């Protein structure tokens, strides 16, 4: 259960960083970044 929570937190962190980078410069169409938009 703890591993799942850590993985979810890491996933959310990466998606937030990706969306921030997307707003700042450009969206790299890789992995979950493309799904997120």
UniProtKB/Swiss-Prot annotation:
Tissue expression notes: Expressed by the venom secretory cell of the spine. The spine is a cuticular structure containing a single large nucleated venom-secreting cell at its base. It is an independent unit capable of producing, storing and injecting venom. On the back of D.vulnerans caterpillars, spines are grouped together by 50 to 100 to form scoli, of which there are eight in D.vulnerans.
A GO term, aspect molecular function: toxin activity
The organism's place on the tree of life at top rank: Eukaryota
Localization per record: Secreted
Coiled coil: none
Cellular component, GO, one term: extracellular region
Main location (coarse class): secreted
Signal peptide: 1-20
Keywords, in A-Z order: Amidation, Secreted, Signal, Toxin
Annotated transmembrane regions: none
Residues modified as Arginine amide: 36
Family of this protein: Belongs to the limacoditoxin-13 family.
Purpose: Probable toxin. Does not show insecticidal, antimicrobial and antiparasitic activities. Does not induce increase in intracellular calcium in mouse DRG neurons, suggesting that it does not induce pain.
Name of the protein: U-limacoditoxin(14)-Dv74
The species this protein was found in: Doratifera vulnerans (Mottled cup moth)
Taxonomic placement: Eukaryota, Metazoa, Ecdysozoa, Arthropoda, Hexapoda
